[in-house]
Design a protein with these regions (language model features):
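Glycine-rich phosphate/cofactor-binding loops in nucleotide/flavin-utilizing enzymes
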Residues: 374-421
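FAD-binding subdomain of flavoenzyme oxidoreductases
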Residues: 149-222
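Glycine-rich beta->alpha junctions and the first turn(s) of the following alpha-helix
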Residues: 205, 212-315
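Generic structural signal for well-ordered, non-transmembrane alpha-helical segments
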Residues: 34, 268, 272-275, 279, ...
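Intrinsic disorder at enzyme termini
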Residues: 2-22, 406-421
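Glycine-rich flavin
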Residues: 52-63, 67-166, 176-186
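N-terminal-proximal low-complexity accessory segments that begin disordered
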Residues: 13-17, 28-33, 42, 48-50, ...
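C-terminal helix-coil-helix/basic helical segment that borders enzyme active sites and/or dimer interfaces
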Residues: 41, 45-48, 316-358, 368-376
Length: 421
């Protein structure tokens, strides 16, 4: 059921690619994302019913060039910095968190493709800038060697952004064991024609617009060029050398670590959603009165003023944390390892990822706290705040925040020289 859309408006893309100043390009992309907000709010009920982004919204994001942000310029992309990507995603999530999740988890993996896969397949896969890829790192399907490639079998759940994806990036179990007895895994880039998208999304508490369907491989043939043996997506990096993308395009962002970037990605989605929640809270402050005497407009009530102000500070703190940490990620990626004591190693990757997870949970706390005073009408099914609340609850229960305590322990072990395992 993969939906496909044609290339974006040529004039818009030509204009974007002609912009040489990164700040100017960022401003243009952020403005395009902001311009979509009212459309996203209006389309949110339809997106939940469809369980993914409605085609007319997907078209608008295509026309704005937003899916091309991480794709190399050599292959039709814009090749922006992650800090720019973050600002755009936050603006999209202000409109609707589910559709932001759908968008972000399909657009984000263009960065990883250049990082991990051989340059020989980049032109074909990026396809002039049309590349989108859902991803899931749990190795729940198998790859068996055959002449010229591999046969894939199995089901992968929670493939967020898959309805419009041209590819899937994930991990397959290989025959045999590693020397230490652990299972062998491979990094897989599977074109959309190798799998079936299952109609099994839309029954969770929230994020029903995220297009997080399962996919099924049924004796699918995968050419050998799309699989990297014994490469674990969780740890696969090039900190001791140069990645295919970094070598080909001279962009160090294609040479960095990505467990941190994934957690940061989820953090920036929740920041945008929290701003959307505060926006809805503010609209009700203007139109509603307090529930106790003297029954004044909420904007005039000292308690509601405090509720609003406290929430705004917490969200702003979360956004600043995300922005500043992305700049640190970029600095580590662009500084030669060891220069000035900078090493983008597993320790730095883990620490940066912890910031993203903490922001996720902090934003959930903000939305929960506002819910206590917004009023019961806001929790009516179909109301904007009700949808944001459900989406944020679903995000808080995501597997990534569940890594929090283990990651905290790793920080202490790393600092005190204690082996992680």
């Amino acid at each position: 059921m993969t939906d496909t859309l044609s290339a974006p408006a040529v004039d818009t893309l030509t204009q974007l690619r002609a912009i040489e100043d990164p700040a100017e390009l960022e401003a243009r992309l952020v403005a395009s994302a902001k311009a979509l907000r009212e459309d996203l709010i209006a389309a949110a009920p339809e997106a939940e019913k469809l369980t993914h982004i409605p085609p007319h919204i997907e078209r608008k994001r295509e026309d704005a060039g937003l899916f091309r942000m991480y794709i190399p310029r050599e292959h039709g992309g814009l090749e922006v910095a992650p800090s720019t990507f973050a600002k755009v995603v936050i603006e999209i999530a202000k409109g609707d968190m589910g559709m932001a999740w759908n968008f972000c988890l399909a657009a984000n993996h263009a960065l990883m493709l250049a990082n991990w896969f051989p340059v020989e397949i980049h032109e074909e896969v990026y396809d002039g800038g049309l590349f989108k890829a859902a991803s899931m790192y749990a190795p729940t399907f198998t790859a068996e060697p055959v002449d010229g490639g591999w046969t894939l079998n199995g089901v992968v759940n929670y493939c967020s952004g898959i309805p419009y994806s041209t590819h899937f990036i994930g991990q397959a179990r290989l025959p045999g064991k590693q020397e230490n007895g652990a299972p062998r895994v491979a990094l897989v880039l599977a074109p959309a024609d190798t799998f079936e998208i299952l109609d099994d999304w839309g029954r969770t508490l929230g994020l029903n617009a995220s297009g997080s369907n399962s996919i099924k491989f049924d004796n699918a043939f995968l050419p050998s060029k799309y699989l990297i043996e014994d490469a674990d997506l969780t740890f696969y990096n090039f900190t001791d050398g140069e990645s295919p993308g970094s070598a080909a395009y001279g962009n160090p962002y294609y040479n960095a670590r990505h467990m941190s970037s994934f957690a940061m990605m989820l953090g920036m989605i929740t920041v945008g959603a929290a701003w959307g929640a505060l926006d809805e809270y503010a609209s009700l402050m203007v139109t509603r009165k307090t529930t106790v005497p003297p029954f004044i407009q909420r904007t005039l009530d000292p308690d509601f003023q405090r509720y609003y102000g406290a929430a705004k500070v917490q969200i702003l703190k979360g956004e600043y944390a995300i922005r500043e940490t992305w700049l640190e990620w970029e600095r580590l990626a662009t500084t030669s390892n060891g220069a000035g004591g900078n090493i983008f190693d597993d320790q730095a990757d883990n620490l940066i990822g912890c910031v993203g997870r903490d922001v996720m949970l902090d934003m959930w706390d903000v939305v929960q706290e506002l819910y206590k005073t917004i009023g019961s009408a806001a929790s009516t099914k179909g109301e904007r705040y009700e949808r944001i609340f459900r989406d944020m609850a679903q995000a808080a229960g995501h597997r990534n925040p569940q890594l929090k305590d283990m990651a905290y322990r790793f920080i202490a072990k790393d600092d005190f020289g204690v082996p992680r395992f």
